[in-house]
């Protein structure tokens, strides 16, 4: 297992972390708790959750999973998505709840106390603003950061992070306080952060915690062109907004993976592990989140962090990705 500090916080965390969105479903809590513990047994320390994942249920599951192992884990949760009253800016409805964005100090403090209770811990290692504030209730970044800094002083939070912000907002957050991390989508198939966010974070010692690095299973090698998703699976219509899910593009991915067979054998790894290792080797991409449902997936995620790719391995994979092209811009190779 490899570990890297969360920016300037001096909090070491495994380069592979567990994304626990699915733990919010309420299905098979016991299996999920076992999966988390298997990953911890294999060296994973970073666990990412949020109050909005199952409206608190994910945090409860994580809290149960880490009982007796608090010193083994780095708990990252979030604030900002608010559904308890009319404070904040409306952003939509989900599961019958009116969801709002609120980064005002009073709602942040309520969220922190609720998260501490659900997780059954005394301190949140990394508290992240889930999304940037929006109109009409546009809480100034400086006001939000002052609240988060106060929570650090009170010992309720160890480090401050943000997620899903623009490069301009990222700079304002960093200038306004001690910023440890930024969470963003980044993968082999979504490399826009390489143009701004990742270089900025690398320059200013801010950790980049990357999610969707396996692109909802597309980068595991297990989603072929003939795969049909169940009606209840959102991926059934994913190609409308994620062109890589088109049948012809899934085949292009499988063809690329087939060319990596010698790498898989040399590193004794799966396609998913190789993909994660390449992602973690990119400049600025310090930590990679992996979703999981089963114990085997937890073990597989942990194993990815043990893979050390050579510079030639990284360059070879990068060249293959360049040749693959980008269906978003309709620039596809071969």
Across the structure, where does each feature detected by a protein language model lie?
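Active-site mouth loops of central-metabolism enzymes
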Residues: 19-30, 93-109, 135-137
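Residues at the N-termini of beta-strands
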Residues: 15, 46, 123-126, 159, ...
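Beta/alpha (TIM)-barrel catalytic core signal, keyed to glycine-rich beta->alpha loops juxtaposed to Asp/Glu
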Residues: 132-324, 331
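Structural motif corresponding to the early beta-alpha repeats
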Residues: 72-102
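Active-site groove signature of glycoside hydrolases
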Residues: 116-135
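Structural motif
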Residues: 38, 42, 118-119, 155, ...
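N-terminal binding-site loop/beta-alpha segment at the start of enzyme catalytic domains
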Residues: 1-77, 81-83
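Short, acidic/polar
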Residues: 27-39, 104-118, 166-171
């Amino acid at each position: 297992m490899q570990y890297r500090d969360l920016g300037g916080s001096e909090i070491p965390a495994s380069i592979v972390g567990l994304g626990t969105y699915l733990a919010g479903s309420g299905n098979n809590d016991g299996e999920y708790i076992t999966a988390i513990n298997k990953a911890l047994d294999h060296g994973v320390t970073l666990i990412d959750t949020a109050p909005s994942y199952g409206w608190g249920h994910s945090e409860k599951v994580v809290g149960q999973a880490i009982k007796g192992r608090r010193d083994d884990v780095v708990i990252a949760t979030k604030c900002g998505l608010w559904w308890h009253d009319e404070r904040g800016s409306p952003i939509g409805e989900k599961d019958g709840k009116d969801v709002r964005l609120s980064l005002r100090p009073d709602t942040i403090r309520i969220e922190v106390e609720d998260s501490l209770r659900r997780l059954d811990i005394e301190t949140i290692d990394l508290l992240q603003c889930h999304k940037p504030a929006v109109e009409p209730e546009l809480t100034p970044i400086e006001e939000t950061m002052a609240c988060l800094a106060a929570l650090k002083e009170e010992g309720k939070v160890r480090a401050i992070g943000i997620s899903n912000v623009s490069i301009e907002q990222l700079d304002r957050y960093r200038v306004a306080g001690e910023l440890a991390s930024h969470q963003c989508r980044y993968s082999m198939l979504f490399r826009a952060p390489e143009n701004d966010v990742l270089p900025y974070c690398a320059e200013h010692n801010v950790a980049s915690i990357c999610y969707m690095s396996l692109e909802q299973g597309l980068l595991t090698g297990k989603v072929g062109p003939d795969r049909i998703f169940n009606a209840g699976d959102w991926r059934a219509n994913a190609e409308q907004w994620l062109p890589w899910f088109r049948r012809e593009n899934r085949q292009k991915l499988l063809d690329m993976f087939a060319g990596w067979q010698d790498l898989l054998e040399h590193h004794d790894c799966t396609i998913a592990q190789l993909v994660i290792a390449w992602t973690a080797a990119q400049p600025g991409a310090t930590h990679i989140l992996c979703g999981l449902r089963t114990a085997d997936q937890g073990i597989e995620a942990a194993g990815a962090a043990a893979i050390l790719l050579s510079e030639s391995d990284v360059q070879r994979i990068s060249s293959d990705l360049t040749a693959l092209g980008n269906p978003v811009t309709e620039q596809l190779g071969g």
